[in-house]
Amino acid sequence: MKKKELYADMQSSIAARLAELRQRDFSVLAELPKYADETHQFGKWEYTLAVWCDRKSEDMTQIVVQAYYHWMLGIGTMLADGFRIQKDGRIVEVPQDERYEFT
């Protein structure tokens, strides 16, 4: 297996987790812990899939899903995507420039 296949799996895991989270109500998402992670195995490689939950206001919660593959000595690859959900259920994507802190 090649690294590009690993990165494709990381992207796929992010998309799947975001799809799952988008199905949940605002009240459920707002109660998620600020950070939770789990280890994923892809061939011989392991990476971390993390969910970041940030309550931006009483009416808005931001969810970011991040995949991180650690290579060595603090060097690795991070990918991230996310959305913001309003109390009324409206969902907007987290802008690209605001995702940089997660990559």
Predicted regions mapped to residue ranges:
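Flexible, low-complexity segments enriched in proline/glycine/serine and punctuated by aromatic residues
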Residues: M1-T103
